[in-house]
Regions:
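Short linear motifs embedded in intrinsically disordered, proline/glycine-rich low-complexity segments
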Residues: 1-167
Length: 167
C-alpha cells in the first residue's frame, strides 16, 4: 500500500485498525479454528485518554496443547498513523506474547497483569525489552497462587508466530 492509499483509507475508515488487523491475522493463521478470548481495557482507563492502562487489551488463544498463548495489543501502532507509516518500528516495535501452562479461567489473570506491568514500565521509562534480556524480579513467585518457583522472566522471540508489519 502506498502512502497516498494509506492516507485515503485512514480518512475513509476512521475506525480502521491496521495494526490490530495484522496481529489478529497472524494469530488466525497459526490458530485457524480458535476464537480467542479477548480482554479489552476500558477506553477511559487507557493512558492515551488520561488513564493508567498502557495496553488496549489482550487475546488469549487455546492452542489445543497444554498451554494458552497470550498476545498484547498496544505496544505496536494499532491505529493509522502517518508518522508511523514506513517507519522502521511501529511504536515500540513489538507486541508481547506469553505462553502459560494453564487456563486463565482456572488461575485468574496473573499473566495479563504481569504483561500490563511490563507495558507500563516500557511506556513510563522508555526502556523496551529485547530478546536475551532477563528480568530478575524481587525474588518472590510470579504466580504465588499456584506456588510457582518462577521468580524472573527471560525475554525471547516468539517461536510460534513470526514477526509482522503492523503499519
Amino acid at each position: 500500500m502506498t502512502r497516498e492509499e494509506y492516507a485515503k483509507r485512514m480518512k475513509k475508515h476512521p475506525d480502521w485498525a491496521p495494526g490490530r488487523d495484522a496481529i489478529e491475522a497472524a494469530f488466525a493463521k497459526r490458530y485457524p479454528k480458535t476464537e480467542p478470548v479477548c480482554f479489552e481495557s476500558e477506553l477511559h482507563d487507557r493512558a492515551a485518554f488520561g488513564g493508567d492502562e498502557y495496553l488496549d487489551g489482550f487475546a488469549v488463544y487455546d492452542t489445543g496443547k497444554d498451554y494458552q498463548h497470550i498476545v498484547t495489543y498496544g505496544m505496536s501502532e494499532l491505529y493509522p498513523s502517518m508518522a508511523a507509516f514506513g517507519a522502521e518500528y511501529s511504536k515500540w516495535g513489538y507486541e508481547m506474547t506469553m505462553k502459560v501452562g494453564e487456563s486463565y479461567a482456572e488461575t485468574g489473570t496473573w499473566a495479563l497483569d504481569l504483561l500490563a506491568q511490563l507495558a507500563r514500565y516500557t511506556f513510563q521509562t522508555g526502556n523496551y525489552f529485547e530478546p536475551g534480556a532477563y528480568i530478575p524480579g524481587d525474588g518472590s513467585s510470579l504466580h504465588p497462587e499456584l506456588g510457582s518457583a518462577i521468580t524472573g522472566l527471560a525475554i525471547v522471540s516468539d517461536t510460534t508466530v513470526a514477526p509482522i508489519e503492523t503499519v
